[in-house]
Regions:
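Conserved binding-pocket/active-site segment within a compact domain
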Residues: 118-224
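An acidic, glycine-rich, mixed-charge low-complexity segment common to nucleic-acid enzymes
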Residues: 1-153, 157-158, 226, 230-238
Length: 238
């Protein structure tokens, strides 16, 4: 059986090698960096923190979470170790997947993280929001849902698996006290949903440019430049 937990951890490990640099526009141009270089966040990003058992994946602090992540990469903890957890396939209240006509599960979150690098690489097809949980006003077809997530930004990327589905990446800012630096964000929660989680939020930023930079070598590749932004940069060089 394919070990989707290992695949997710391996993808997360690959993503940690890069810094995704977004140039955003609304009223002014904003530049932010998105990093996933904190390995202890893996258990939260893919939902393992919500599993009450088995004990092998229980982690209550950063050191324990790093240890769990390392053991997954070493295949000392595999998906077979958690597949019988009653929480793994329990429906997440308020979510809805039009493809399966049912709510999402923690297992669905793990499967999504297998695709994390691809999602980030094509995130220019999505939108970036400043997130305010107090403005969350999510209404599904059959229930109301309040998203109580303490994030600073929300990156929303259309799914390639289902035209109704979006990939939601919640990000927190680690350098709020450094006003002279570009905003630095870290991914700490991610999941898919066909319910619109952006209702009530302010208008999104336009993604003007997306660059992927390898942290160790500083090599970078521009994944996308908005035509209008490209033109403005060309005019600035004249």
């Amino acid at each position: 059986m394919e070990d989707i937990l290992y695949n997710a951890a391996l993808t997360f490990s690959n993503v940690m090698k890069y810094d995704y640099i977004y140039t955003l526009g609304r009223k002014t141009v904003l530049k932010i960096s998105v990093l996933s270089n904190r390995s202890y966040l893996f258990t939260h990003v893919c939902g393992l923190d919500h599993l009450k058992e088995p004990p092998v994946i229980t982690a209550n602090n950063e050191a324990q979470k790093k240890k769990v992540y390392k053991k997954i990469l070493q295949k000392k903890i595999t998906f077979s170790d958690i597949q019988d957890s009653p929480d793994l396939n329990e429906f997440i209240k308020g979510t809805y997947n039009t493809a399966s006509d049912s709510p999402y599960t923690i297992k669905d979150r793990i499967i999504m993280i297998e695709e994390l690098e691809c999602i980030l690489d094509r995130s220019f097809t999505g939108k970036m929001y400043r997130w305010d949980k107090n403005k969350s006003s999510v209404t599904a077809a059959y229930t109301q849902r309040y998203i109580n997530i303490n994030a600073d930004f929300l990156l929303v990327v259309p799914s390639e698996r289902n035209p109704d589905e979006k990939n939601y990446l919640f990000l927190y800012q680690s350098n709020k006290n450094n006003k002279n630096e570009d905003i630095c964000l870290h991914l700490f929660s991610a999941f898919s949903d066909c319910v619109d989680l952006t209702l009530g939020q302010e208008a999104p930023y336009t993604i003007l440019e997306l660059t992927k930079r390898e942290i160790e070598t500083k090599d970078e590749i521009t994944l996308f430049t908005h035509p209008a932004y490209s033109k403005s940069k060309d005019l600035a060089l004249v």
